[in-house]
């Protein structure tokens, strides 16, 4: 499981000209599911994101989590995080999970994130989406449940 996590002052996702998800200050999470990912990967990823200390404390240190600051989360499913560009010019997505599996795990991740008491907005699974954001910092992290990076 892979995620790109960005600290934002605001973010939104639009499908067919309609805003389907919008947040204020918090985290934009681009969320990818790989072949073979399990509930253990999901639990690790959601726990990691919910607890990441990416927000400044009173001394200006990144010492507070999205939970600590009452931030929001916009989660957008993105299979292209599994694009392999090592050969040729066109990425291969062979290591991305099939849509049925990815959709189920994405919905479970959203539910688990909401279980932390966080306000979570989402995009639309498998839709063409436009994501707008104002990156704060900028703070952008790559997270992989296999701990590849």
UniProtKB/Swiss-Prot annotation:
Keyword check for Hydrolase: yes
Enzyme class: hydrolase
InterPro entries: Daa-tRNA_deacyls_DTD (IPR003732), DTD-like_sf (IPR023509)
Known EC number: 3.1.1.96
Stored Pfam families: Tyr_Deacylase
First-listed, main subcellular location of the protein, grouped into a coarse class: cytoplasm
Reactions accelerated catalytically: glycyl-tRNA(Ala) + H2O = tRNA(Ala) + glycine + H(+); a D-aminoacyl-tRNA + H2O = a tRNA + a D-alpha-amino acid + H(+)
Short sequence motif Gly-cisPro motif, important for rejection of L-amino acids: positions: 137-138
Cellular component aspect of the GO annotation: cytoplasm
Hydrolase is among the record's keywords: yes
Alphabetical GO biological process terms: D-amino acid catabolic process
Annotated localization: Cytoplasm
Function: An aminoacyl-tRNA editing enzyme that deacylates mischarged D-aminoacyl-tRNAs. Also deacylates mischarged glycyl-tRNA(Ala), protecting cells against glycine mischarging by AlaRS. Acts via tRNA-based rather than protein-based catalysis; rejects L-amino acids rather than detecting D-amino acids in the active site. By recycling D-aminoacyl-tRNA to D-amino acids and free tRNA molecules, this enzyme counteracts the toxicity associated with the formation of D-aminoacyl-tRNA entities in vivo and helps enforce protein L-homochirality.
Family, as annotated: Belongs to the DTD family.
Domain notes for this protein: A Gly-cisPro motif from one monomer fits into the active site of the other monomer to allow specific chiral rejection of L-amino acids.
Subunit comment: Homodimer.
Name of this protein: D-aminoacyl-tRNA deacylase
Lineage of source species: Bacteria, Bacillati, Bacillota, Clostridia, Eubacteriales
Name of the gene encoding the protein in the UniProt record: dtd
């Amino acid at each position: 499981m892979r995620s790109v996590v960005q600290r934002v002052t605001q973010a939104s996702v639009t499908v067919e000209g309609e805003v389907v998800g919008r947040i204020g200050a918090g985290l934009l999470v681009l969320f990818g599911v790989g072949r073979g990912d399990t509930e253990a990967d999901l639990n690790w990823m959601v726990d990691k994101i919910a607890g990441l200390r990416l927000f400044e404390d009173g001394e200006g240190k990144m010492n507070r989590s999205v939970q600590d600051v009452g931030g929001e989360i916009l989660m957008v499913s993105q299979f292209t995080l599994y694009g392999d560009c090592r050969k040729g010019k066109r990425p291969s997505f062979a290591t991305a999970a099939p849509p049925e599996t990815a959709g189920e795990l994405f919905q479970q991740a959203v539910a688990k994130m909401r279980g932390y008491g966080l306000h979570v907005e989402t995009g639309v699974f498998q839709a063409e989406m436009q994501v707008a954001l104002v990156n704060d910092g900028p703070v952008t992290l790559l997270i992989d449940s296999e701990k590849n990076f």
